[in-house]
Structures are given as structure tokens and as C-alpha cells.
A protein has these predicted regions:
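Generic C-terminus detector
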Residues: 232-236, 242-258
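Short amphipathic beta-strand starts and helix->beta connectors
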Residues: 3, 222-237
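Internal nucleotide-binding/catalytic subdomain
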Residues: 11, 18-161
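A conserved helix-loop-beta module that forms one wall/lid of the active-site cleft
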Residues: 1-18
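Short amphipathic alpha-helical segments
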Residues: 16-18, 196, 244-250
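A structural signal for short secondary-structure junctions
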Residues: 141, 189-192, 221-222, 240-246
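Active-site "cap" helix and flanking loop/linker of ATP-utilizing ligase/carboxylase catalytic domains
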Residues: 112-134, 152-222, 235
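Short beta-strand/turn micro-motifs at beta-sheet edges
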Residues: 83-85, 185-187, 232-240
Length: 258
């Protein structure tokens, strides 16, 4: 009845790998079968959600709120598909950049007015005022309208790795102001730099992959470079080895994306 493409999602937490976009009805049936019968996502896929497929530009809004005031961090866009050219399965994120070139102050005000403030008002009306981080995954449709694809109450990965380096204020002071209910007085300058991050993943991710491979890292002292560890650990000999699907995020900071 829904037609294709559609979106099939696991109803539980699946480390960013629980969303599928089948192009045909047959693929949709196959994915549902793998999740419900073969339990490819374990308990996370015990129940599924079927959603409309929405076209447009997807982006991430990270914001801090003390329950009354919202402060939006620099915009970001992550890339979830495993392969180049926006191909392959969805992942927890294979890379990101910040800020998004086509996002301006007018757009941010629109997000605050249309998405964030109504959300906070709704929470207050439900008797659950919220203080903390809001992650809104937003699709900007070709006509400029907004669809909220997901909400989280945490920073994103890899979005945080590119947003925080270009954030012009003191993030610790911002969190402190949030906890004190004084966020309305917290200001910071516009980003003057851009950040681009690329995830280094284990072969086979997000499907079956092996771990325990020894790795070495060079370039940690390069100016304008950050290397964030994720799926790494030390073996009994003290060697750095892989321990997960997404192993490292390498971030470069510069004056422009070019």
C-alpha cells in the first residue's frame, strides 16, 4: 500500500544501523523478514516502524536548552551511507562537516521557531521540562519546508567532532549556564573556520567485520588536525588495536571546505 521507496526502521537502539531504504516492495518485504524473523539486529529489531520516504537535504541541528532558552550550535551535515556516492547501507555516520554552507541565520531562526521551541513547549505541557542537549535530524525539502526525522537527547557522532572545534565559545561555560538556567545571557561569535571529518571504519562495516587488528597513527601533531578514537583499545602487549566498526574520526580544520 505504501509503495517504494519507503523507510523501514528498527524500533530499538541499533547504533545508527537500524534504518533501511528499500527501493522496491520485494526489498522491503525481505528487510522486514530479516529483522523480524532472522533477528539481524537482535532485540532492537523486534518491532519495526515504516515511514514515508522524504527527499531533500538532510542535516543535523545540535542545541542546548535550559528548558526556556535554546542556543543552537553550528550547523552540521553527516553522511550515513557506507559507500561513496551515497551508496550502501546506513551507518552511524561515515563523516561530517560544519558549518553547512547554505545554512544562514534566517534558516536557524526558522528551525528554532518551527521545531525547537514548540518541542520545549510540548514537553513543559506534558509535565516533563527538559534541560540538556537536543539533537534534531532535519530534512529540508525542495520547497523549503522542514521534516524532523529523529530526535535524540545527546550530541551526534560524528557531528560533535566537527561542531565543537568550530564553536566560537567556551562549551564548558555554556553547559554551566545551562545547568544554572542562565542560558539566555550566553553569547558566542559566529564560526570563522570550517571542520571536515572522515570516519575510518573496519572492513565490512556496518555488516560483519573483524576486530583486533593492530594500527598505528601518524599525523596527530599536524596543525589543524584532530584524531578522535572510537573503536580502539589496547591488547595485552599495549598495542593499539581495532575494537569496533567505526575506528577513528580524522578531522581537519581550515578556512573553507576547499
Amino acid at each position: 500500500q505504501q509503495g517504494a521507496p519507503i523507510v523501514v526502521k528498527a524500533d530499538g537502539l541499533a547504533a545508527g544501523k537500524g534504518a533501511f531504504i528499500p527501493e522496491t516492495r520485494e526489498d522491503a518485504v525481505s528487510i522486514c523478514s530479516m529483522m523480524l524473523e532472522n533477528m539481524i539486529l537482535g532485540p532492537a529489531g523486534k518491532n519495526i516502524i515504516i515511514e514515508d520516504y522524504v527527499e531533500g537535504q538532510e542535516m543535523t541541528i545540535l542545541a542546548i536548552t535550559d528548558g526556556e532558552t535554546v542556543r543552537i550550535l553550528p550547523s552540521s551535515q553527516d553522511h550515513k551511507r557506507a559507500l561513496d556516492g551515497d551508496k550502501g547501507n546506513n551507518t552511524g555516520g561515515m563523516g561530517a562537516y560544519s558549518p553547512v554552507p547554505w545554512v544562514d541565520d534566517e534558516f536557524m531562526h526558522k528551525v528554532e521557531k518551527v521545531v525547537l521551541m514548540p518541542t520545549l513547549e510540548g514537553l513543559r505541557n506534558e509535565g516533563i521540562p527538559f534541560c540538556g542537549v537536543i539533537y534534531a535530524g532535519i530534512m529540508v525539502k525542495p520547497d523549503g519546508s522542514l521534516s524532523v526525522l529523529e530526535y535524540n537527547v545527546r550530541l551526534g557522532d560524528p557531528e560533535a567532532q566537527v561542531v565543537l572545534p568550530v564553536f566560537g565559545g567556551d562549551f564548558g561555560e555554556m553547559i554551566l549556564a545551562c545547568c544554572k538556567g542562565e542560558l539566555s545571557g550566553f553569547k558566542w561569535p559566529e564560526p570563522e573556520r570550517v571542520a571536515l571529518g572522515v570516519v575510518m571504519a573496519s572492513g565490512g562495516y556496518p555488516e560483519k567485520y573483524d576486530t583486533g587488528f593492530e594500527i598505528s597513527i601518524r599525523g596527530e601533531d599536524l596543525p589543524g588536525t584532530f584524531i578522535y578514537h572510537a573503536g580502539t583499545s589496547s591488547d595485552c602487549g599495549g598495542n593499539l588495536v581495532t575494537s569496533g566498526g567505526r575506528v577513528l574520526t580524522v578531522v581537519g580544520i581550515a578556512g573553507s571546505l576547499r
